[in-house]
Amino acid sequence: MERTSKYAEAIDTASQPETVIRASSVTGQQGHLNSVDMPLVETWRPEGPRASQQNHILLSPEQEVSQSSNTSPTSESDPQAFLEASEFPQNQTKTSRVDPVHMEIDDWAAIDQPMADSAQPDFEDWGDLGDLMPEVLPESSGTSSGAATDNGTAADDENRCWDHGCNGKKFLNHSNLVRHRRENGSARPKFICPMCGAYFSRSTARNQHLEKKSCNRVRRYSNGRERPRLRVKD
């Protein structure tokens, strides 16, 4: 029982790099494991990061100090030494940039002079165009005003009624003119006052006329012309 438990313990501890030395030391001291079982523990070699950890563990303190002293300086520990060891030194990298062309003050003045002369426009050639502008503007404004007046007179003529004895009665808009023609047309019945013979396009207007007893009042158009009185047939 003791032999099997120690064998299982040695196999479990072999999965870590630190336990390899421990397993070999246990087998060396006690000698209970067989010679066939020894290579299973001693010949195992970890790979990758574990190998570096094992190598680090196996080194003695004196070897670690000597190895750390022999390491070369890197760019992180000493950037100046890294630049000196490289092919392109620091001074050469700074001077590798292309500087702008340096010119003297006299050269800049000679270049600016023709540019300043060409930037100034020549106003002498604009005299004819300036004389024509005042003459063109009034003509354009006059034509626009004339077109506006023509449109206004045409609209006024369209909103006038020359039928039904209206003698060119003017309405505010076209819709009022259409309603006037519909009310005074032959298709719509006319409501006549039985007292004076006046006719109305709506029954409400005829009834108000009778209530106010305005039969003796002379009825006139909006332009002041007297309306003809219709005679009621017996």
From Swiss-Prot:
Supply one GO CC term from the record. nucleus
> Keyword annotations for this protein?
Metal-binding, Nucleus, Repeat, Transcription, Transcription regulation, Zinc, Zinc-finger
Report the protein name in the record. Answer: C2H2-type zinc-finger transcription factor clz7
Zinc fingers (C2H2-type): give the ranges: 159-184, 191-223
Location, primary (coarse class): nucleus
MF term (GO), any: zinc ion binding
The answer to whether UniProt assigns keyword Amino-acid biosynthesis to this entry is: no
Identify the InterPro entries for this entry: Znf_C2H2_sf
